[in-house]
């Protein structure tokens, strides 16, 4: 994994970054419905399929891989991996597990299953310890669907990485849908970039229809 520093003097986005990071700090969230019919009617497991799809599109675009390091320098990770929530039924609290991103869907799912088997019973916020710096957060709230969702972060104006939150899927008119909230920083990500992400994410989900696995 490489962390490439951004040269602010020559960066084409310098004016926008300065405006939305310093002058008028601004984050925003967008909630959309994704068609997951191909996943639900196929044999793919839902959660790893969604994690793979989100990670694939995150790794396509630099604006979703930018952060500020410990020295206050802005840079871009060469690759990101998901750090996602799992629910602990006995404590009614969640834990986080991270899984290495692998471009091959089948291999990614195998790594997901391996992590779940090894760390899924661990308690605490980090069921799988020592998360790398190049992880991004994904949450699943499977108990209800929603049409709007946003996070209120006290220090969110300094956080550049995207945050993804899925809700409960539902069936409507013969199709399966799931809500997804995407929270981003306007300093690095405009509406165009978020909409492109959503459109590409839907395409990746559609492409998973021919992949097998145990249904979840």
Curated annotation (Swiss-Prot):
EC number of the protein: 2.3.1.28
UniProt keyword Transferase present: yes
GO biological process: response to antibiotic
Catalyzed reactions per annotation: chloramphenicol + acetyl-CoA = chloramphenicol 3-acetate + CoA
First-tier enzyme category under EC: transferase
A molecular-function term among this protein's GO annotations: chloramphenicol O-acetyltransferase activity
The keyword Transferase appears for this protein: yes
Pfam families noted in UniProt: CAT (PF00302)
Catalytic residues (UniProt): 186 (proton acceptor)
Keyword tags: Acyltransferase, Antibiotic resistance, Plasmid, Transferase
Subunit: Homotrimer.
NCBIfam families named in the record: chloram_CatA
Functional summary from the UniProt entry: This enzyme is an effector of chloramphenicol resistance in bacteria.
Sequence similarity: Belongs to the chloramphenicol acetyltransferase family.
Protein name: Chloramphenicol acetyltransferase
Organism, scientific name: Vibrio anguillarum (Listonella anguillarum)
Gene assigned in the entry: cat
